Amino acid sequence: LWDTSVVQWGEIDIWINNAGQNTTRVFSWETDGTCTENIIKTNLIGMIYGSQIAATGMLKQGHGAIYSMEGLGSNNMVQPKTILYGTTKHALTYFMRGLAKELEGTNVIAGRLSPGMVLTDFITKTPDGKRSEVFSDEKFRKTFNILADKPETVAKYFVPRILKNLKNDAQIAWLTNRKAAWRFMTAGFRKDRLI
């Protein structure tokens, strides 16, 4: 991926690890071994490999920024039936903060992107492509319609901030605690807006 990108664009200024996988919404002991391995390989090992490749290439070229996409678990929140996903995102945050420390004194920075809840197939479909049970979970639907956004909304917020950021170990957060509180206070205006 790095080599192909360098051939296409010459240099890579920004690298974003955004691959993510989830399990079906079941308790951790009900998740089969293959699903457990896949989520760890995608969310954690893939992010680590991507970061290693990017750091090596960016240190050679003399500059760059590496970001990884946080998620549920990055903020220490524990949500039943999502703990395998949350565990990988908690580890992702630790890794990226550690990578930032290791990159201190270089012209390469590492940071984290915190999008909040985003309406993608990740939420609306199961890992095998079927319609997710979130549509029938009334509590989840209500919360999702209050807090979630479309990908293009979050991207419009992230892109200019990523381009301007020069700070190592930065967290660029879309759905802040303050914004979430405001959305709950104005929840009556957000009914069924996404799902």
Where would I find each of the regions flagged by the language model?
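Conserved mid-core segment of classical short-chain dehydrogenase/reductases
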Residues: 22-37, 81
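Catalytic loop of short-chain dehydrogenase/reductase
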Residues: 67-91, 96-97, 101-104, 117
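Conserved amphipathic alpha-helix within the SDR
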Residues: 1-10
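A short, exposed helix-loop element centered on a Lys and neighboring polar residues
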Residues: 51-52, 97
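Short, flexible catalytic-loop segment of classical short-chain dehydrogenase/reductase
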Residues: 75, 115-125, 129
